[in-house]
Structures are given as structure tokens and as C-alpha cells.
A protein has these predicted regions:
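ATP-dependent carboxylate activation and anion-phosphoryl transfer catalytic cores
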Residues: 7-26, 48, 71-73, 89, ...
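Short, solvent-exposed coil/turn elements at secondary-structure transition points
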Residues: 34, 54, 108, 136-139, ...
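A polyampholytic, Gly/Pro-enriched intrinsically disordered region
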Residues: 122-131, 153-154
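ATP-binding N-terminal substructure of ATP-dependent carboxylate-amine bond-forming enzymes
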Residues: 1-126, 138-146, 179, 396
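Acidic/histidine-enriched active-site and ligand-binding environments that engage anionic O-linkages
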Residues: 147-156
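N-terminal nucleotide-binding beta1-loop-alpha1 segment
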Residues: 159
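Structural detector of well-ordered beta-strand residues that form the stable sheet scaffold
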Residues: 29, 79, 101-103, 131, ...
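Glycine- and other small-residue-rich loops at beta-strand/loop junctions that grip anionic moieties
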Residues: 59, 80-84, 108-112, 133-136, ...
Length: 450
């Protein structure tokens, strides 16, 4: 087992990784920018190293600084968390070249799945169902029009190197297509340095359902069920739950085994998530995330499997200790992403937390690096923490979530807690009758007023 792990991240995920390391008896190294000197993961780690000024490009994305921190501390492995360098294949290669283990997938799989066009082609070859669309990047507007007419409008123009909703535009008619192509290309170039785009059939009211996988790189891989991430705003997930209200056990087992078989074929290593749109009883592959997900605790709550701990084990060369037949699903779990933002305008609200009281009780988990007196810096993602609740049934889980949300106190900054308090009292959410466009319609209709 590794002796010392450097955690190349910040916030709640840095603390989450630190806890897994402690439970394995592994020494921890926290890295931080000057803005994060008082962060909780820095306080709790065995060692800490300042890697640069507040800007992420000068600190958390600064590969030479991270390598220096590994050398100074003698860390023999790096866990990248999510975001930042977690899906950077070159970073994984550089670490390996310097004798440091990367706790994550093989670089070739990170690179493959980071290219959305190649990822879709590979998924299709592996037997994973995909959304009808172009076979590769669009070469001209004329080609795009021909493909769009073939698959039928509306269509979605997507950046090949995209993610997080950037470089995505809908064209409802042939007349809309040139503008959608031009806008998506411009956004893709600005965000990813690559203006390649491709076309997919636009699904009007799908759910966003993802399958959690875990592989050991030796040909063993399992699935850990699904998460329903359909409550989204601007393609950003807000609330996740498992199991999905839309799936039954046979549908879950079928798509899960398709995905797990595909991961066995490529000898996938570490945790990963295969994401689908789901409509009219059919799954359509959209992408694969080759990292731990923000919403991984939902899966941990219903399977009692520590995903971060398993990431560390298999990165050290261990075979999976869990067979598919050993995976059991218990009850229901829901996660709310609590952001330091205005709940209506979603403007970030950095500042000092004056009062902080996270909820507790049976079946309640809070993954957060916040504490009373903590000053939320303005330089990074506004995620304050995650409230995860488990119950024997979905109904019990929702009642427990209502109670936990009402108990949660954060003063000094604005948060999205009021949004979640409204959502868990809405009939559609209570019935599980929502899709990926539902939340934006709810907000537009004044579902939550400032």
C-alpha cells in the first residue's frame, strides 16, 4: 500500500480523500493556494505545501508546483479528486514518468473518453447504445444539414472536447442550424481550444441517468447501479438520487451489465461514470467521466462501498475485492449540492461564514470543508458542501431530507438551501416526475422567488 498520498485538490473532495487515506493508515499531503491557507483539508493533513497564488492556473493547475510538492514531501501517489487535473491524461503520464502513481484511470482511457467523438465511437463498438448523430466531427454546414435532415430536427450541436454544457446549442429547424454551429464552435474554441463539433438527435424530455463503474485494470469491473441526475440548471447537476424513480430492477441490471462488460473489455482502471440520456425506455450514451464524481456519496450510501478507498486500492495494483454478485442495493439516497450562491440569480456569494450548523441524525451525511468562521474565497467553484440523506424507501428519504434541510444553518453568505427546501415540497419532485429541463422551467415560472 502507498505510504503517502498527495491530494491535488481543495474543498470538500480534498477532505473526502483525506478521510479515506486516514482509514487506510496512509500519510496525507495537502496542497493549497495562498487563498486556501486556512482550509480544513490543510488543517487536518499530516503535511501541507503552498503551491501558488489564488488563481487556479498558478496553483491547482500548476503541474511543476505539484511535482515539486511530491518531491519535497516524498509522496508516492497523487489523488486528483474531481475537476482541475483529474481528467488530464498528460498529468497522469508526467506523474508516472517521475515515479509517482496517479490514482485514477490509465492515461489512454482518460484521453479516449475526453474526446467526445472518439468516446461515442468506442461506446458503440463496445455495445453501449448511443444517441443517433454524426459519425465524427462536422466538416461543413452542408454536411451538418444533411445529417440533421436524416436524423430529424431538433438537433443538438456539441463540442467534441466539451463538458459542463459549454459548446452546446440546439437547432430546432434547418434555419437555426448555421447560427447554432457557429456559436457552438466559437464557445468550444474559447473554452477548450478546439472548435470541432458534432451533431446528435435532440431529445425533448429525457432523464439524465449515469452508471457508476469500478475496475481494477486487470479485466475485472463491476457496476454499482445508477444515479438519476435529471435536476439540472444550465447542464449543471443540482440534486442526484439513487435508485432512479424511472428504472426498475431489470432495466438497472441490463444497462449495468452492458456497461460493466464494456469496462471489462477495455480493462478499465479505477472509478468511472458512464452517462446516458434516458427517454421512452431507451438509453443513449452521452459521455464517460474518468474520475470520481461529485455525487459519488449517493452510490456509497446505497451500496456501503467506499469508492475513494477502492480507487486507492486498485491504483496500488490490487484486484477488485468485490464481485458483481456481492453488490447489494439498500434503500434510497438523495444528494443536494449546497452552493454559496443566491438561490434565485445563482450569483456566487463568497464571504465569511458567521454561523454554521450542519444537520445530523440517522441516515444524514454532510460532505463539506466549511466551518464557522471560514472565509469562502471568490476564486473557485461555489460548492459549499453536499447534503446526502439515506432512507429505507424513497418516501422516508424525502422526509428525512426535508428535516435535514430545515436543520441546516449557514449565515454570513447566501446559499441555495432555500431552493432545495422548495424542491422537496414540490409534487413533481415528490412523485419523481421530472426530466433534465424541469428545473429551469420551475425556476422560470417563479417556483422560487427572491
Amino acid at each position: 500500500m502507498f505510504d503517502k498520498i498527495l491530494i491535488a485538490n481543495r474543498g470538500e473532495i480534498a477532505l473526502r480523500v483525506l478521510r479515506a487515506c486516514k482509514e487506510l493508515g496512509i500519510q496525507t499531503v495537502a496542497v493549497h493556494s495562498t487563498a486556501d491557507a486556512d482550509a480544513m483539508h490543510v488543517r487536518l493533513a499530516d503535511e501541507s505545501v503552498c503551491i501558488g497564488p489564488p488563481a487556479a492556473k498558478d496553483s491547482y493547475l500548476n503541474v511543476p508546483s505539484l511535482l515539486s510538492a511530491c518531491e519535497i514531501t516524498g509522496a508516492d501517489a497523487v489523488h486528483p479528486g474531481y475537476g482541475f487535473l483529474s481528467e488530464n491524461a498528460r498529468f497522469a503520464e508526467i506523474l508516472t514518468e517521475h515515479g509517482v502513481h496517479f490514482i485514477g484511470p490509465k492515461p489512454e482511457h482518460i484521453r479516449l473518453m475526453g474526446d467526445k467523438i472518439e468516446a461515442k465511437r468506442t461506446a458503440q463498438k463496445l455495445g453501449i447504445p448511443v444517441v443517433p448523430g454524426s459519425d465524427g466531427a462536422i466538416k461543413s454546414d452542408q454536411d451538418a444539414l444533411a445529417i440533421a435532415r436524416d436524423i430529424g430536427f431538433p438537433v443538438l450541436v456539441k463540442a467534441a472536447a466539451g463538458g459542463g454544457g459549454r459548446g452546446m446549442k440546439v437547432a430546432d429547424t434547418a434555419a437555426d442550424l448555421p447560427v447554432a454551429l457557429a456559436t457552438a464552435r466559437t464557445e468550444a474554441k474559447a473554452a477548450f481550444g478546439d472548435d470541432a463539433v458534432y451533431l446528435e438527435k435532440y431529445l425533448a424530455t429525457p432523464r439524465h441517468i449515469e452508471i457508476q463503474v469500478l475496475g481494477d485494470g486487470l479485466g475485472n469491473a463491476i457496476h454499482l447501479g445508477e444515479r438519476d441526475c435529471s435536476l439540472q440548471r444550465r447542464h449543471q447537476k443540482v440534486l442526484e438520487e439513487s435508485p432512479s424513480p424511472a428504472l426498475n430492477a431489470s432495466a438497472r441490471a441490463e444497462i449495468g451489465e452492458i456497461v460493466a462488460t464494456a469496462m471489462r473489455q477495455i480493462k478499465y482502471l479505477s472509478a468511472g461514470t458512464v452517462e446516458f440520456l434516458y427517454q421512452d425506455g431507451r438509453f443513449y450514451f452521452i459521455e464517460m467521466n474518468t474520475r470520481i464524481q461529485v455525487e459519488h456519496p449517493v452510490t456509497e450510501m446505497i451500496t456501503d462501498i467506499d469508492l475513494v478507498l477502492e480507487q486507492i486500492r486498485v491504483a496500488d495494483g490490487a484486484a477488485l475485492a468485490i464481485d458483481q454478485k456481492d453488490v447489494e442495493f439498500h434503500g434510497h439516497a438523495i444528494e443536494c449540492r449546497i452552493n454559496a450562491e443566491n438561490p434565485v440569480s445563482f450569483r456566487p456569494s463568497p464571504g465569511r461564514i458567521v454561523h454554521y450548523h450542519p444537520p445530523g441524525g440517522m441516515g444524514v451525511r454532510v460532505d463539506s470543508a466549511a466551518y464557522q468562521g471560514y472565509a469562502i474565497p471568490p476564486y473557485y467553484d461555489s460548492l459549499l458542501g453536499k447534503l446526502i440523506v439515506h432512507g429505507k424507501t424513497r418516501g422516508e428519504c424525502l422526509m428525512r431530507l426535508k428535516r435535514a434541510l430545515d436543520e441546516f444553518v449557514v449565515d454570513g453568505v447566501e446559499t441555495t438551501l432555500p431552493l432545495f427546501r422548495a424542491l422537496v415540497r414540490d409534487k413533481d419532485v415528490l412523485d419523481g416526475a421530472y426530466h433534465i429541463h424541469w428545473l429551469e422551467a420551475f425556476l422560470a415560472s417563479g417556483g422560487l422567488e427572491e
